């Protein structure tokens, strides 16, 4: 058993030794083959690298040679071009030298001719001075003077002709424009009426209007400032007042009282207050109406109200609002005919008399007041100038201001447009009221009875009873010294204390 194992081990050992030996021999042989093959590959690679190296060197030499040859050819071409350019420059230089010589020769020739001409000119000038007996300066002055006189004569003749043609054409053109404008406009003619008539249902109503001891008629006259005349006119009462606003308030109030039938001082006061508010609203509506008719927008409320007040104002018998509207239409048409600013001309013409609708105690004329109001209304400076210059109080600054003056003159000069007697009468009554209202403590003054009576309402807190007579005398003396009037003027002072209490 042991022997078998030993034999087996020996056999295994021998087998392993033989296998290892065979493996070593095979590896050595294979390594030798690989080395030979690697050496062969290396030799081939070296040969190929050497071949490529020679090829690259050869190509590089050929490239360098080609570049060198090309550079040499380029250099030869540049040298040839430079030589040709140099030859051309030399030729040009020679030509310029020749031309310069010719120019020098011609310049010398011209100088010689110039000197010869100067000598000839001097000789001829001396000969002319000897023949004419005038020196050069004298002859020049004589010629200039003759030419100047001739030019002045021709210029004056041309100026005269232009002025004559311009005057003729301007007059004809202005006439055509005015005729065309006046034909395009139609204006209502309104007269200044200082009295209104209120129809009564019966004669008995006159007694109710007068009231017990005249209380009703006195209250109506005191509240409205109008003169209520109850005479023999059948079924009619006459209301007289120079202020159209107060006359309108009195007329409407009396008509409503007659229609209502309740006529007593308290009812009269209530109706007058309500009618006063309605008339104030009508004033604003009249201003809006004329603005709408003329197509004017962006007017401030105070301006609209001032325009509306012109509806109740008259100037020489002419309604001021209608007059302003007519002037605005005329000015806009004139502006369109001559190419001026139509909007500015129309706006300035409408506002030119707005100062007459401003309630103020200032002694300035209506043009100054209107110009100040237009400036406060942020109107265009040309509109402000047109308002202030329509009576030449200031210098017009633009053609639109002149157009407003022309349109104002056309409207005022239209036959039947104005009546001066009525305006003088109204002015006298306004001055009469202004004198009384100028005293301290006077609240309101009304001229009635065609200016023969002045009723003055005084403040009972400022004027006690003991001073009423003295105030009346002062007002009468002031009227005597400041106004001229026919007959006598009755001054009546009214001082009233009213106490109102409520029982609860």
Curated annotation (Swiss-Prot):
Entry keyword set: Cell membrane, Endonuclease, Hydrolase, Membrane, Nuclease, RNA-binding, Transmembrane, Transmembrane helix
UniProt xrefs under InterPro entries: HD/PDEase_dom, HD_domain, HDIG_dom, KH_dom, KH_dom_type_1, KH_dom_type_1_sf, Ribonuclease_Y, RNase_Y_N
GO terms for cellular component: plasma membrane
Domain KH: 194-279
GO biological processes: mRNA catabolic process
Keyword Zinc: no
UniProt-listed HAMAP family: RNase_Y
Protein name, per record: Ribonuclease Y
Lineage start: Bacteria, Pseudomonadati, Spirochaetota, Spirochaetia, Spirochaetales
